[in-house]
């Protein structure tokens, strides 16, 4: 048996191709059931995200092309469309690849943690479809523990490398417990949505969303349980916000120094943390002159991100060493499993010979043969049968002058070396 990792990702395929090769929730179970019925395939897990689609299989050696052909048939793709984008990894490299993916080492954003949750979800789908057991099950469980070890033993996840995450991380410097804060999000685009997700991960439950049009703001509000307002209403609610994060396409500032000053008075000068991600600025630069207002811009965040990316790169190098260690440990276990069937077959063969000779000896005793003679005959026949194959191997090695093989056979048979 062999392990296979086959797929495409953001490095090898365009968004258009990744969309065509993706497995949605409506077809993933059917796909798993189909995949494990392909010739030679015994186990399968399908990982499908916006940045990658990968098939992990336990299968007979040489069956990788069958998996590729199945992928093409399932999605109705021509070979020419995917051949240049597909990568395949076997055994040790397949194990290393999965571990790297689980640790975020192969992600678009180095070290991002979301991929681990996505892999766990993919593994759960495979379990529900009864598509995973044995070696592949052990591999995924091992990969989860490797990802946890990397997070614990390195700083790969400790530093913000996206604007949205950096904005929230800065908030944690001002407020040790973000769950106790109320946040005003100005804008309703992709960056603000990511900010909202990071805030929710920090257990922030009180959010306000202000946007030029209410429709988009209401979509965010429904997902995050936020209060909705127009940009014109910001002055009425600004004093409620401990944190303000703004990212709009407005050509002019939305929040001015006077507006913040009035809000601070209403807050009895309780500190307010403001992050302006927009270009051009949403918040007047003069706000930073207020003693209880802490204003950061996208330039401040970019400097933090660059420093943190270097930290992550150093941590990634440490993580790669951990991955290699854990891969070697897993492969030691995996190779040992190959001997289990061999040992079982060898024991079964020996037991079969012993049972046959025992029955023959018992029959001789029933027919009146002397017990000592019957036992001696059984022992002689049993010895001859059990040493027949090793004897043939020794004779063949000696005839060929293969001293290395003779030495190995001596070791295997427990004979003293000359």
Swiss-Prot record:
It catalyses: (S)-4-amino-5-oxopentanoate + tRNA(Glu) + NADP(+) = L-glutamyl-tRNA(Glu) + NADPH + H(+). GO terms for biological process: protoporphyrinogen IX biosynthetic process from glutamate. Pathway: Porphyrin-containing compound metabolism; protoporphyrin-IX biosynthesis; 5-aminolevulinate from L-glutamyl-tRNA(Glu): step 1/2. Keywords: NADP, Oxidoreductase, Porphyrin biosynthesis. The record marks 97 as: Important for activity. Substrate binds at residues 49-52, 107, 112-114, 118. Its EC number is 1.2.1.70. It holds the Pfam family Shikimate_DH. It comes from the Bacteria. CDD domains: NAD_bind_Glutamyl_tRNA_reduct. One of its GO terms (molecular function) is NADP binding. Coiled coil: none annotated. NADP(+) binds at residues 187-192. PROSITE patterns: GLUTR. SUPFAM superfamilies: Glutamyl tRNA-reductase catalytic, N-terminal domain, Glutamyl tRNA-reductase dimerization domain, NAD(P)-binding Rossmann-fold domains. During catalysis, the active site Cys acts as a nucleophile attacking the alpha-carbonyl group of tRNA-bound glutamate with the formation of a thioester intermediate between enzyme and glutamate, and the concomitant release of tRNA(Glu). The thioester intermediate is finally reduced by direct hydride transfer from NADPH, to form the product GSA. PANTHER family: GLUTAMYL-TRNA REDUCTASE. Homodimer. Possesses an unusual extended V-shaped dimeric structure with each monomer consisting of three distinct domains arranged along a curved 'spinal' alpha-helix. The N-terminal catalytic domain specifically recognizes the glutamate moiety of the substrate. The second domain is the NADPH-binding domain, and the third C-terminal domain is responsible for dimerization. Catalyzes the NADPH-dependent reduction of glutamyl-tRNA(Glu) to glutamate 1-semialdehyde (GSA). This is Glutamyl-tRNA reductase. The gene is hemA.
């Amino acid at each position: 048996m062999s392990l296979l990792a086959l797929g495409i990702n953001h490095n090898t395929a365009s968004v258009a191709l990744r969309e065509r090769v993706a497995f949605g929730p409506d077809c993933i179970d059917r796909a798993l059931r189909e995949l494990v019925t392909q010739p030679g395939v015994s186990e399968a897990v399908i990982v499908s995200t916006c940045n990658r689609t990968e098939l992990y299989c336990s299968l007979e050696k040489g069956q990788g092309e069958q998996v590729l052909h199945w992928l093409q048939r399932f999605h109705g793709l021509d070979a020419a469309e995917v051949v240049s984008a597909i990568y395949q990894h076997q055994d040790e490299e397949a194990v290393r690849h999965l571990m790297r993916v689980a640790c975020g080492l192969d992600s678009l954003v180095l070290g991002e943690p979301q991929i681990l949750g996505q892999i766990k979800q993919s593994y759960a789908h495979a379990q529900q479809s009864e598509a995973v057991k044995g070696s592949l099950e052990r591999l995924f469980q091992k990969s989860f523990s490797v990802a946890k070890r990397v997070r614990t033993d390195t700083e790969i996840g400790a530093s913000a490398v996206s604007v949205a995450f950096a904005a929230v991380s800065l908030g944690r410097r001002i407020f040790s417990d973000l769950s106790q804060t109320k946040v005003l999000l100005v804008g309703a685009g992709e960056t603000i949505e990511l900010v909202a997700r990071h805030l929710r991960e920090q257990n922030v439950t009180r959010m306000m969303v202000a946007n030029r049009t209410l429709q988009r703001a209401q979509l965010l509000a429904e997902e995050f349980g936020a209060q909705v307002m127009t940009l014109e209403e910001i002055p009425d609610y600004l004093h409620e916000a401990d944190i303000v994060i703004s990212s709009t396409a407005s050509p002019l500032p939305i929040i001015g120094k006077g507006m913040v000053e009035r809000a601070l008075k209403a807050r009895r000068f309780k500190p307010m943390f403001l992050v302006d991600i927009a270009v051009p600025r949403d918040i007047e630069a003069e706000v930073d002159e207020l003693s209880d207002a802490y204003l950061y811009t996208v330039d401040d965040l970019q400097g933090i991100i660059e420093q943190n990316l270097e930290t992550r790169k150093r941590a990634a190098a440490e993580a790669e060493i951990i991955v290699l260690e854990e891969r070697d440990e897993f492969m030691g276990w995996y190779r040992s499993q190959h001997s289990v069937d061999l040992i079982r077959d060898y024991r079964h063969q020996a037991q079969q010979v012993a049972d046959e000779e025992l029955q023959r000896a018992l029959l001789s005793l029933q027919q009146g043969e002397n017990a000592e003679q019957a036992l001696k005959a059984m022992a002689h026949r049993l010895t001859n049968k059990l040493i027949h194959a090793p004897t043939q191997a020794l004779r063949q090695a000696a005839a060929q002058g293969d001293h290395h093989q003779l030495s190995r056979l001596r070791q295997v048979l427990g004979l003293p070396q000359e």
